[in-house]
Amino acid sequence: MCERTPLNPGHVGSLLNFAPPDSLYFSNLRGNGSHIPGLHQLPYNRRDVCTLPWTSTSNSCTPGPPAPPQTRAFGGYCPPFFPNSGFLNSSSSGGHVKTHLEESRCFPGTNHKTEEAGRQDEVYAGEHGGAGDRGYSDVDRSHGSAAQLDPDSALHVNGTKLDQNPIHGSSSQTCNRSTLAEGAPWCCSQVKTRKKRKPYSKPQLAELENEFLMNEFINRQKRKELSDRLDLSDQQVKIWFQNRRMKKKRLMMREQAFSVY
């Protein structure tokens, strides 16, 4: 059960008849641990061999320092199982290439990860950059097509605008005139026109003064008679009497003020 080899005297072999683990990592070693004639020897020492995960628990080996960078496979991971170990002894070049392939497949390095991340970034940037370029090109193309209009159509549009402006100006002038003259409600004017005040004539004022001296307050029937006789409206007669009463009141207040002083 305990198998001693020139490399590791304290190595404990497996219960099954598998190939020694040293032959899985060193292509120039035979199954029994001896070197193949005609091949160069790998530079390793007993401390490197004792850093294997299945030999680290051996009592005869002392735990050594961490493995060098070139032995990435000795990091505690179990190597792949080869049922037929004959290809390891066939040729050094073939075994070396296959070992490196298995190693790169089982234990991908950081460089491989960074390369894959860089490729993904390039693909992402390519896709989105292309989409962005396409979007900008579409926008530029649309702006260019909008800018390159037919000159005839532009002249036609300008001509219609120029033709419409005189019509609009004449219509606005007409609207202003009608608003000032007639007070048409359909024209939207800010200043609401007021009906021109029609002054009272001297005969009308004389008749109204006589009626006021007789009676300051008149009823509706009397107002109607005055409006018909003087050719005035009821509103005009009513307003005149109101103003005349206020005038009389002011005169009385002024007389009282003068009498005090």
UniProtKB/Swiss-Prot annotation:
Which is one Gene Ontology cellular component term of this protein? nucleus
Q: Which residues bind DNA?
A: 193-252
Primary localisation category: nucleus
Instruction: Write down the CDD domains for this protein, in alphabetical order.
Output: homeodomain
For this protein, what is any one GO molecular function term? DNA-binding transcription factor activity, RNA polymerase II-specific
Q: Which keywords does the record carry?
A: Developmental protein, DNA-binding, Homeobox, Nucleus, Transcription, Transcription regulation
One Pfam family from the record: Homeodomain
Q: Which family does it belong to?
A: Belongs to the Abd-B homeobox family.
Q: Where is the composition biased (Basic and acidic residues)?
A: 112-122
- Residue span of region Disordered: 106-158
The entry's function note states: Sequence-specific transcription factor which is part of a developmental regulatory system that provides cells with specific positional identities on the anterior-posterior axis.
Per the record, the gene is hoxd12a
> Which named protein is this?
Homeobox protein Hox-D12a
Cross-referenced InterPro entries, in alphabetical order?
HD, HD_metazoa, Homeobox_CS, Homeodomain-like_sf
- State where the protein is found: Nucleus
